[in-house]
Amino acid sequence: MNDRCFGRMMAMAAIVALVALTPLPAAGQEVPWYKIVHSRCPGEPGKFHPCALEKAKTFNPPRTPDRKPDMQGHWIGGPESSQDIEEHPESFGIPANPTLIVDPADGKIPYQPWAAAEKQKNFKEYQDPQGQCFPSGVPRQMYVPFGFQILQTPGHVVIAFEHNHASRIIPTDGRPHVGKNIRLWEMDSRGRWEGDTLVVDVTNSNGRPWLDAQGNFFSAALHVVERLTMVDTDTIHYDATIEDPQVYTRPWKIAFPIRRNKQPDHEQIEYACHEGERDEQHIGSLGYKTYPGVVPPQ
């Protein structure tokens, strides 16, 4: 086994350890997330997506004082797809998962030819930025398997994540995006309500995060449109349309269920990433570099 292969195994093992430390709900956790039924809808994204959208049509959600759907509370972290957004078998202790991609139908990211080769290069040469404690970015932060809390005020929705102390402050008051020359790890989010659906327009990426630990990537031209719709009091249907004409051949979509954390004594833990961290030094010493982002061919 060469050093490069060993380094990748070390990286995977480190992430397995992090996942093992994640606080999990007491009931039903041995059941894979995609086999849990939500409002009589299968949890697997390809089946949950159309079923949940249909269920949401007849659900009247609880309301905030300003009559918006009340999504506040603690929610269980997204599906365990931060390792690989596409379908994959169990490997190095990482559980098997179905693809999060519901469009196109084959569940694959529709890369341009040069970008498909670039993805392979990323996996072979660079450390996962999230593994180096950089922000996960959008949409990855939504399917990292750590919990988060949603808070709402008139004109804002706030998502406070347990993972890496990240937070998203989403104005819903109609203000424009920040200037196009401002480039951010977590991008710039602007929300609006379309009926009972929170629609979030996300722009201004710096092109540095990955979609998962496999090197799946985007450029600074990334544009994401997220839609969050309550299916019942304890389930949110999440979908995101992902567009980057410099990297992909077409827009594509992911979808999955978000479940409420119903533990009455739940608290989000203080997340430590850099403190006492040594794996980054070990992996870096084996030749894996910090990902610089990509400059698409002209």
Report residues per predicted region.
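Bacterial N-terminal signal peptides that target proteins for export
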Residues: 2-13
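PEST-like low-complexity, intrinsically disordered acidic/proline/serine-rich tracts
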Residues: 2-3, 18-298
